[in-house]
Amino acid sequence: MKTLESLVAEKLLKIKAVKLQPANPFTWASGWKSPIYNDNRKTLSYPVVRSFIKLELARVISEKFENVDAIAGVATGAIAQGALVADLLGLPFVYIRSTPKDHGLENLIEGELKPGSKVVIIEDLVSTGGSSLKAVQAVRNFGCDVAGMVAIFTYGFPVAEAAFKDAKVTLTTLSNYDAVLEEAVRTHYIDESEIAVLQ
């Protein structure tokens, strides 16, 4: 029987939310060159995949965290999935901007969140952890308790693992880079000779 990590990896590869190009690396927004590109927003266009991810995120939250008061999504990639999960769990939803609005109330957190609330943050993708932990800090600065973060995918970079540990935040992901590589080889998306470039 397949693990959750493998099932999610299979779905992400199938809809091309994850692309692997060992011979022609992608350039990320950070300027890094990488043989993998992940765009989990694509999952929203596939009802079966979208629903599967929503159900699994909700299951993880229900199993790992007690007495959650609200769900927060990190803008922009986790807004839709976060709202779907909050709806399924019957919880309030807010989203966290990367920077405050430059007009109006200049909010960093959009929606109604009560100070003292226990919040689970949903993220679509964790790479270095920088933007994810910035969202955690915004919720903490608002006077709320961050129970943890749940994400669809992580690259598993050691720098991110260390950053989450330093910030005392539990990170749980549905899938990861290693699971994608295993699934990509199993389904012949890539061949064994390309693995060395990808590891």
Predicted regions and their residues:
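Phosphate/pyrophosphate-binding loops at sites that engage ATP/ADP/AMP, CoA/4′-phosphopantetheine
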Residues: 57-69, 136-142
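Short, glycine/charge-rich flexible loops or terminal/linker lids adjacent to PRPP-binding catalytic cores
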Residues: 76, 82-120, 128-134
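Short glycine-rich phosphate-binding loop at a beta-alpha junction
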Residues: 66-75, 150
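PRPP-dependent phosphoribosyltransferase catalytic core
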Residues: 2-14, 137-199
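Active-site-facing substrate-recognition patch
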Residues: 1-65
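Conserved acidic residues
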Residues: 69, 117, 147
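Conserved hydrophobic/aromatic pocket- or pore-lining residues that grip, position, or stack substrates
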Residues: 31, 71, 93
